[in-house]
Amino acid sequence: MVMMLWYVLPLLLCSPCLLIQIPDEYKGHHVLEPPVITEQSPRRLVVFPTDDISLKCEARGRPQVEFRWTKDGIHFKPKEELGVVVHEAPYSGSFTIEGNNSFAQRFQGIYRCYASNNLGTAMSHEIQLVAEGAPKWPKETVKPVEVEEGESVVLPCNPPPSAAPLRIYWMNSKILHIKQDERVSMGQNGDLYFANVLTSDNHSDYICNAHFPGTRTIIQKEPIDLRVKPTNSMIDRKPRLLFPTNSSSHLVALQGQSLILECIAEGFPTPTIKWLHPSDPMPTDRVIYQNHNKTLQLLNVGEEDDGEYTCLAENSLGSARHAYYVTVEAAPYWLQKPQSHLYGPGETARLDCQVQGRPQPEVTWRINGMSIEKVNKDQKYRIEQGSLILSNVQPSDTMVTQCEARNQHGLLLANAYIYVVQLPARILTKDNQTYMAVEGSTAYLLCKAFGAPVPSVQWLDEEGTTVLQDERFFPYANGHLGIRDLQANDTGRYFCQAANDQNNVTILANLQVKEATQITQGPRSTIEKKGARVTFTCQASFDPSLQASITWRGDGRDLQERGDSDKYFIEDGQLVIKSLDYSDQGDYSCVASTELDEVESRAQLLVVGSPGPVPHLELSDRHLLKQSQVHLSWSPAEDHNSPIEKYDIEFEDKEMAPEKWFSLGKVPGNQTSTTLKLSPYVHYTFRVTAINKYGPGEPSPVSETVVTPEAAPEKNPVDVRGEGNETNNMVITWKPLRWMDWNAPQIQYRVQWRPLGKQETWKEQTVSDPFLVVSNTSTFVPYEIKVQAVNNQGKGPEPQVTIGYSGEDYPQVSPELEDITIFNSSTVLVRWRPVDLAQVKGHLRGYNVTYWWKGSQRKHSKRHVHKSHMVVPANTTSAILSGLRPYSSYHVEVQAFNGRGLGPASEWTFSTPEGVPGHPEALHLECQSDTSLLLHWQPPLSHNGVLTGYLLSYHPLDGESKEQLFFNLSDPELRTHNLTNLNPDLQYRFQLQATTHQGPGEAIVREGGTMALFGKPDFGNISVTAGENYSVVSWVPREGQCNFRFHILFKALPEGKVSPDHQPQPQYVSYNQSSYTQWDLQPDTKYEIHLMREKVLLHHLAVKTNGTGPVRVSTTGSFASEGWFIAFVSAIILLLLILLILCFIKRSKGGKYSVKDKEDTQVDSEARPMKDETFGEYRSLESDNEEKAFGSSQPSLNGDIKPLGSDDSLADYGGSVDVQFNEDGSFIGQYSGKKEKEAAGGNDSSGATSPINPAVALE
């Protein structure tokens, strides 16, 4: 059995060996036990004639206990009494007095029970038996009570006396309760008090009812007739106490019980009662006010409740008071109660009996129920400070003692035995137990021993040596062993040995010391923003033999994932908290635990964010509104762990701008009030927003609205301008005042104007709109202008004078060009002379320079002109034109402009010199053999001059030699060049440049070689699909891989399933073909596919055709001869013809849109090469047009179209006799007499770049 050591520690706190009784585990010995009272009746019993009376007295002991009783100190024999039944149960001396004999009065008295055996006598406490008869109200004659209206009266109850508590009810003859209030109430004594009577109190049936719970009966007093004499002159009087009647009284309250104080007063008007405790505050948590404040109940009275309690009765005429002086006393209570013990011979026995009470109780001792004074004087005892001490006890000293404490409020009795016994030592802890603990902790090995005398206990290690030589080992008085600061080498076996004068015994305890749990990486404290997520990480090391776990706590509460919320995510030692809120901040701890230990690592999470709303926004100092001021104050906002930097004060005017807030300014974050300067006539509603480093928080609740008084404007409009929109007017404009600057419900503007410098009388007009049109002015004349704000309270300040002008006309003069300086082939400088300002007819705003490309110097463009513009400031008379095309003609115009528009233009034409060409287009490499490559290219889009040829250079990328080889190709019409003697094992970098007289231009670069460097050719992404009688093999040719031929062989499996005549024959295929379709296969048949070259297997595949089984393949013809196929092809051809006719009809309708027109809007004739990533197929104009008409159709099914990249594909390129090129690579004859046909099949298509849809580049 393995014991976890945290369960052991409470056992170490038990008393050592000397127990109240012999342990149950101590078996195998016949041990006697002195008498012990186990149950007895309460100290006071109140019984009634019909009740059965049971007096209980039960006790245990060995040998069997005998019982005897005394009544009023005289021996009482229950068995000999008539009507008494003795209980014959074991361990019981109880008896019952039966209630049907009405003998209760005869058995009244004080009883005591004695339980005895050979070892002593135990004694019960005194039991007082009180017998009551049936309650009866004494016969009396009740006289009517007469009283004048407004006077006080007391209706007495005087119920019969009773030993048991009773309840009093006042009712009338209809069994309705008398209504009680501050004027009418019942006292604790049962009397009914009237502070003053009213005529409505006049009744003849006031009945006092007494309820006796013991007899379960209610008896009534004779009805009282209350007669109230009406009066017309009720006299007010001050309060007088009806109970108690004197000014003060003294009471004794018992500690731990309740104290009830009562004051009932009379007077008119009806007095009110309140209670005072002059010396100390009233203990409100223990005070209950009842009966309309006339009764004070103080619960659980303590010594601190000593003192004066005053009741005060008050009305409008005066007051009356009564002082209760309360003394708190106490019945005896235990400080230390004597306990029974077992002792061995020769030991000293000590029984402590410490009691307390007020007054101090008297303590007496008894031995076996007899007063200690009557015991033989040779007993070895003494009494010291209330304790009974016996020295050198022997078995004959076994006894039962009684300690009794008594004062006037009660008595206490305790039985305790001294049992002197000789018992052999015995270890009650199980033998061979295993204990586990972790390194660094404290282990507790149990050894519970019992015997008399008390056994001595020692612990030994495996070698029989005492363990106490190590200071880490410490014994407990009860025999257990503690080992602090455990180490791994403490693991082992330990022996506990217990011995007394009769024997010695030994048990084995096994200790296993495990590795302590350690947190290797604990969570770290962090600061996160509200709404973010935080991750805490925890890693720990555990003893591998223990079951371990990692849990998380937040502020001491266990955290777990919840199915209805994703707030927490816990996995693999991580705690993730999502959507952080301020309530999430606190301490988070990782708890790594095993069944032996647990360690905890804490981290603090601080959630920060923008502040909370500003509370308690208040307005004050309203008298300042007349001066357009107000005082605003607020309480600090919750800063959410980031200091508040400032408060933003905003206002809203719900009349002029509802739901729009304007800032009045900001104050420092440590300021919580400010006096605001306000504008006249604004309906201010304020709010305040706190701001910290994380931004503004929620605004405060809005304040109440205040309105400032109206006033004359304090500002005039700004940005006053005078400009004409016609040649004979002037439009005066200004920026209107904001509504908050109106200072009144409405605003107008007083506008004044006059010609500048003529000192004429000001003309004026008052308007509401923010503009005024002055008509019939001369062209471009200066005016003085003033604009002043006006409202119903007066005018604004004197406005400033602004100079404006009437309308402008178009400039009448063109700039005179001075010269044009050519910087280089793409940049020129244009200069002109300043214009005459008098001819500008307005403010000279600048110059507009317009220029456009007219065409190459070889040939002018006929397409749409695209013009470029440049605006030059008025103080500048030159412009640099850059980004021009080399070797081109340009037209330039310069115009002056004012606010009205542009004037006449000065024109000039210039040409740019020749430049270097752009890079050639579409350089491609085609492998001819292992040592040769054919290079294809297209001329550059931008010649920038006259092409003189091409410069080709290349060098190997690998190998030792990096020598650059150059070829100067002087034929500008050349489009291909063949390179030989290349190394098949190397890759090359090829660079091609076009040249003009200015030199080579930008290069186009490609890298490649003749063959793959290693192994077999690469069939990238090769795949195979199958139908019922065909299969398609597809692959992606690798760029730079030489084209080569190989054959594909389909072989049916298993062999023999298909006859040799029906086996497909090997077919030759080109690598660049990228796919191959094998027809005439058998359905539902598996085929092996071999790709072979010169008997070398290049690739191996397998495929299975669809269908239900082999079919006979026709040897007379293919499916192309079937009727359905012929009809299908005919339908397609007919559809294509219809589409072609529709296309020609459409082209003929738009015939005016020729290739020439389209080229004018897109490209120069120099820059219309046809290109494709696979070199492009150049055809005659007619064939090109035909291809474009069917550019989107699929190839025919007869397989006659030759795939791109085949061995014969070069025949389709530039060698065609129908194709002619001019010097820059464009087609000769594109504009020669076939315009309509060209328009029908020209560059209209928006399809992708291809040999039949060439890309068009704009120059």
From Swiss-Prot:
One of its GO terms (biological process) is dopaminergic neuron differentiation. Isoform 2 is predominantly found in the brain, while isoform 1 is found in the peripheral nervous system. Residues 613-711, 716-809, 811-916, 919-1014, 1016-1116 form the Fibronectin type-III domain. It holds the Pfam family I-set. It is a single-pass type I membrane protein. Residues 1243-1252 have a biased composition (Polar residues). Residues 35-128, 138-225, 239-327, 332-419, 424-506, 517-600 form the Ig-like C2-type domain. The modification Phosphoserine is found at residues 1165, 1180, 1183, 1196, 1245-1246, 1250. One of its GO terms (molecular function) is axon guidance receptor activity. Glycans are attached at residues 100, 202, 246, 293, 432, 489, 504, 670, 725, 776, 824, 848, 875, 968, 978, 1021, 1029, 1072, 1106. Keywords: Cell adhesion, Cell membrane, Cell projection, Developmental protein, Differentiation, Disulfide bond, Glycoprotein, Immunoglobulin domain, Membrane, Neurogenesis, Phosphoprotein, Repeat, Signal, Transmembrane, Transmembrane helix. Residues 712-724 have a biased composition (Basic and acidic residues). The chain crosses the membrane at residues 1123-1145. Residues 697-724, 1182-1209, 1228-1259 are annotated as: Disordered. GO terms for cellular component: axon; axonal growth cone; cell surface; dendrite; dendritic growth cone; endosome; external side of plasma membrane; GABA-ergic synapse. Disulfide bonds join 57-113, 157-208, 263-311, 353-403, 447-496, 538-590. The keyword DNA damage does not apply. A motif (Cell attachment site) lies at residues 553-555, 562-564. Neural cell adhesion molecule involved in the dynamics of cell adhesion and in the generation of transmembrane signals at tyrosine kinase receptors. During brain development, critical in multiple processes, including neuronal migration, axonal growth and fasciculation, and synaptogenesis. In the mature brain, plays a role in the dynamics of neuronal structure and function, including synaptic plasticity. Interacts with SHTN1; the interaction occurs in axonal growth cones. Interacts with isoform 2 of BSG. This is Neural cell adhesion molecule L1. It comes from Rattus norvegicus (Rat).
